[in-house]
């Protein structure tokens, strides 16, 4: 299987470290540990053993998410990912098969668009119009 090149991400990767002001970046500048944790909290981390963590998120974090959204579900219904790209990938890989159809709003971040097409999923676009206030 050959995946389509994700041109936006490719261009950002090529040039993101070559500019003084990166206007294409959608994330935030990384913080330092000292900006997040107190000295005591930093020392606590230094005393922790390193081990292979929970791939689906710690039970405590999953419970906190569950507490926010719905009390009628169990921890098995909550999955923590390392970011939206992983969540998008898991959604496509577990919910769709070749020949299935999805409707995808554009303009948008095109990760799902290219991944789905590479897997034989039919992608129909729903263009949002500037002149209609980004509605369809």
Language model region names:
Residues 35-36, 92-93, 115-117:
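Short amphipathic alpha-helical segments
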Residues 83-84, 108:
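Conserved glycine-rich SAM-binding loop
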Residues 96-136:
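PLP-dependent aminotransferase-like
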Residues 2-83, 90:
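N-terminal small-domain helix-loop-helix segment of the aminotransferase-like
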